[in-house]
């Protein structure tokens, strides 16, 4: 069976169980609310919530890029009679277009775009304003900027005029953006002249809701005209969405925006002036980048290496199975000797490329160069060596390699840096010169290859000449000229060691060069290959013969590396390009807990104390006995059969569903509308109700056949969803019995730092060959039959390797779910898991906090690292990279049964971090 079919079959089994449970009617809705979305069109429809939208998208998507499809959807909506007024069409068009651009994953289309309004310019012409809020950040800069272009495209189709701002409005924007940058920090803060260019030329008004407490100080009480020509005031509070769209969108992504607007015939050529200005400023980017690197330092999180500094991390291009999409590789010896501040998954802030990364161990790159207390200076390349010398290190001279992919430079729009001279570069040069599979076991072999094939010296035998001055090189050359040479013959390759007098800073020069040596009180000894290499590179050799009296070509106006190349019998490359790094956040793998952590979304106000303890509230009620009951704000559920008010969506007295009814806040009459038809006042679906808590809990315990109320049972102070819907207490009791906690949407979650992986060893993942075969793994990465736990296997891209604490979390949640199915819903248990090994092969949902589309994943192994390993395709499908952020994991059936939109708050951003839809198949195309 194909991989996707396996996932689909397992999902359908879980979904059938969840639908059976929900059909009992015990939950606020009698159906599973997480909608599976097999493709982009389905995801967009799920996010927007408009039935039939997917079919329109599919009908217009053939042969189009995402950007072209987004503009086409604007055209389809704005030229149709089906979608209401001009304002309604433009709002829907903006949201649908942005949802297409963001692949139907993030909530920015619905939460970040709060509305579209028509206004009048001073000359009486109409214009369009689009209202943004903070969640627009989740769309990314280019998509956020293109949402403005989408509205521009739509307003032209609807023959609505362009925005013509007054000078007072422009100056208000400029002040507002500077204040926002002070209180919230923009990733990109454009010059004021760029802001004025945008504001004077953008044909759509970028408007927004107030998001910050800060207010404008100078340009206050600015007036504008509404759609009817009446004056209205613009809020004096700062609008975060406005700043994000203008600065991190239009200004920062001007080049991309211009390209896409050209493609659809929109004249946004005014962006050229901003792009030209940006190009003129790139020469200053390096200095500002270094300053930015040192901003926001946190006490206790050390700076490991400064940018472009001697001894900092050496840039090495490449990728390992743990790196890419912002994850960087470090030698395990570097991680150990740097005080073990760096672990697998630790976030580091780096000066380039991008801003952050997570650390991954890579044992095939160069480790740190250190000086021991004994005086020996040497390179440490393995974890075993590092642990052996850990307590003997006097100082770390060079911290080793950082492995970076080309894609990280491209994605972050960072100019490529010159590569360090590494073994794979030398091997490529040798192969180009005609020598395949070149190896140099010692300096003599490297010398001979260099001479024969006219290629530079092997990187193992060159040193950091770019880190010393020409004067220091001249001083070192004289010291080597006077050195005592231990040699069996008068040729270069017979040198066993050289002893240099330990005076005048020679030891420090050798350290910065990273030449292995042993420092004694009076002398410094350099042995064998490195002695031969240093003598040759300083110029004391003619065709392999020693000539210590040779006159060297030393021009102090040149760099040390240039002088070496003037004298050495072979070419010596610049060895290192340096990268700065400092510790960011530590790695994380931990159950997500609200504070205090509830087992149930049942409100008890102040009755349970600060811990919101339902047990304490119950015992308090029991002690009062004659005065039972608490007053809490909750929905007015009316039993459909018995017609009496009940505490939840199901009336067990009459075995009937209950529905939420609305009541007038003024006259108290029941109504189905938001406005009372009798007195015109607002109606409400909730009120402060007197609840017999003791009876409610006793009934819940009886319903699930529990012995008594768990002492650790906790609820919440209150619920803030629209109708004040509460969760059945039975679920909370069962969670408490299994020590499981709930999040605000009814799910139980485990958070872990994102970490990429493309290949794994079965022994690493703690999974047997037999179990892997059941999951579809029958070959290693070379297509050999999988027979040994030591074979390297390519990871299927929706499979994940979870932290062991996460596996234990899944185990207890599975046991809770089985109890829930059996004791609350009257169904058969599904998981029947006894150990964490039983969780292998089961499905989970992973989700990023700025999105509302979960990804279906399968557990295939465990790790002791405090991270969540996933294929780069899965991480990217969550609209993430691995720069130190964390995502969450939920057991599939727990989410399908217990998640409800009815629990979500109605505030802006309320649907973020909620699995409204589920991507079943991650299609990397």
Language-model segment annotations:
Residues 885:
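Conserved structured catalytic cores and adjacent interaction surfaces
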Residues 872-875:
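Short hydrophobic "helix-edge" motifs at membrane interfaces and signal-peptide entry regions
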Residues 1-837, 841-855, 859-863, 877, ...:
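Extended, Lys/Arg-rich, non-catalytic nucleic-acid recognition/anchoring regions
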Residues 869:
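Conserved phosphate-coordination/catalytic loops
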């Amino acid at each position: 069976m194909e991989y996707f079919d396996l996932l689909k079959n397992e999902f359908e089994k879980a979904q059938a169980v969840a639908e059976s449970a929900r059909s009992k009617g015990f939950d606020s809705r009698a159906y599973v609310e997480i909608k599976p979305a097999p493709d982009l069109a389905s995801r967009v429809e799920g996010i927007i919530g408009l039935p039939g939208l997917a079919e329109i998208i599919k009908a217009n998507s053939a042969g189009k890029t995402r950007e072209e499809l987004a503009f086409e959807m604007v055209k389809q909506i704005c030229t149709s009679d089906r979608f209401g007024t001009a304002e309604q069409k433009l709002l829907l068009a903006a949201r649908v277009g942005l949802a297409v651009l963001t692949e139907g994953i993030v909530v920015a289309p619905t939460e970040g775009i709060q509305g579209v309004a028509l206004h009048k310019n001073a000359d009486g012409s109409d214009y369009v304003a689009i209202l943004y809020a903070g969640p627009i950040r989740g769309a990314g800069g280019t998509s956020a900027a293109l949402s403005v272009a989408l509205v521009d495209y739509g307003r032209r189709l609807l023959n609505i005029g362009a925005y013509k701002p007054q000078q007072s409005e422009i100056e208000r924007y400029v002040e507002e953006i500077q204040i926002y940058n002070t209180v919230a920090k923009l990733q990109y803060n454009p010059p004021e002249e760029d802001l004025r260019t945008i504001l004077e030329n953008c044909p759509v008004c970028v408007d927004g809701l107030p998001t910050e407490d800060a207010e404008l100080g100078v340009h206050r009480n600015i007036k504008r005209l509404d759609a009817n020509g009446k004056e209205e005031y613009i809020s004096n509070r700062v609008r975060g969405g406005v700043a994000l769209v203008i600065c991190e969108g239009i200004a920062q992504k001007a080049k991309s925006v211009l390209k896409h607007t050209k493609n659809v015939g929109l004249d946004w050529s005014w962006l050229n002036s901003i792009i030209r200005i940006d190009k003129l400023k790139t020469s200053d980017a390096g200095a500002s980048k270094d300053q930015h690197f040192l901003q926001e330092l946190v006490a206790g999180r050390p700076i490991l290496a400064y940018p472009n500094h001697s001894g900092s991390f050496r840039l090495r291009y490449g990728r390992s199975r743990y790196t890419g999409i912002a994850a960087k590789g470090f030698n395990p010896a570097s991680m150990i000797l740097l005080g073990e501040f760096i672990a697998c998954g630790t976030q580091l802030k780096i000066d380039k490329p991008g801003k952050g990364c997570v650390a991954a161990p890579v044992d095939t790159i160069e480790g740190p160069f250190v000086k021991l207390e004994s005086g020996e200076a040497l390179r440490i390349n393995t974890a075993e060596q590092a642990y052996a010398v850990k307590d003997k290190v006097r100082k770390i001279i060079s911290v080793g390699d950082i492995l970076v992919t080309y894609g990280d430079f491209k994605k972050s729009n960072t100019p490529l840096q010159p590569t360090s001279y590494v073994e794979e570069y030398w091997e490529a040069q040798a192969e180009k010169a005609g020598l395949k599979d070149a190896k140099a076991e010692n300096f003599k072999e490297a010398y001979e290859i260099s001479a024969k094939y006219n290629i530079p010296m092997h990187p193992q035998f060159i040193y950091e000449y770019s880190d010393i001055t020409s004067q220091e090189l001249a001083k070192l050359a004289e010291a080597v000229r006077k050195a005592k040479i231990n040699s069996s013959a008068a040729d270069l390759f017979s040198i066993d060691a050289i002893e240099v007098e330990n005076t005048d800073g020679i030891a420090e020069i050798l350290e910065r060069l990273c030449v292995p040596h042993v420092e004694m009180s009076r002398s410094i000894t350099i042995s064998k290959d490195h002695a031969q290499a240093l003598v040759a590179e300083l110029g004391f050799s003619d065709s392999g013969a020693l000539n210590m009296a040779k006159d060297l070509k030393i021009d102090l106006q040149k760099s040390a590396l240039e002088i070496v190349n003037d004298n050495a019998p072979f070419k010596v490359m610049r060895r290192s390009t340096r990268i700065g790094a400092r510790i960011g956040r530590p790695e994380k793998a931990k159950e997500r807990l609200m504070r205090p952590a509830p087992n149930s979304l049942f409100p008890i106000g102040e009755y349970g104390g600060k811990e919101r303890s339902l047990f304490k509230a119950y015992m308090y009620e029991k002690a009062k006995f004659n005065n039972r009951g608490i007053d809490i704000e909750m929905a007015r559920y009316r039993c459909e059969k018995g017609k009496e008010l009940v505490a939840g969506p199901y009336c067990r007295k009459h075995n009937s569903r209950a529905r939420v009814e609305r009541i007038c806040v003024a006259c108290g009459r029941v109504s189905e509308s938001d406005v009372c038809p009798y007195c015109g006042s607002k109606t409400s679906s909730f009120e402060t109700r007197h609840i017999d808590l003791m009876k409610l809990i006793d009934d819940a315990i009886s319903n699930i056949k529990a012995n008594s109320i768990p002492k650790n049972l906790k609820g919440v102070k209150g619920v803030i969803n629209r109708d004040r819907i509460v969760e059945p207490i039975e679920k909370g009791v069962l969670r408490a019995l299994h020590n499981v906690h709930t999040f605000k949407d009814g799910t139980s979650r485990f958070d872990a730092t994102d970490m990429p992986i493309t290949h794994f060893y079965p022994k690493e993942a703690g999974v047997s060959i037999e179990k892997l075969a059941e999951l579809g793994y029958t070959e290693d990465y070379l297509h050999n039959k999988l027979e040994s736990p030591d074979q390297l296997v390519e990871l299927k891209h929706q499979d994940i390797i979870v932290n062991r604490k996460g596996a234990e979390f899944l185990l207890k949640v599975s046991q809770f779910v089985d109890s829930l199915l059996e004791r609350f819903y009257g169904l058969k248990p599904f998981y029947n898991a006894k150990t964490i090994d039983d969780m292998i092969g089961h499905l989970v949902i992973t989700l990023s906090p700025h999105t509302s589309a979960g990804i279906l994943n399968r557990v295939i192994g465990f790790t002791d690292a405090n991270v969540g390993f996933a294929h780069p395709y899965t991480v990217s499908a969550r609209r993430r990279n691995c720069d130190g952020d964390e995502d969450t994991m939920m057991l599939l059936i727990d989410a399908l049964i217990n998640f409800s939109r009815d629990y979500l708050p109605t505030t802006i951003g309320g649907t973020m971090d909620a699995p409204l839809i589920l991507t079943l198949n991650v299609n990397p195309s």
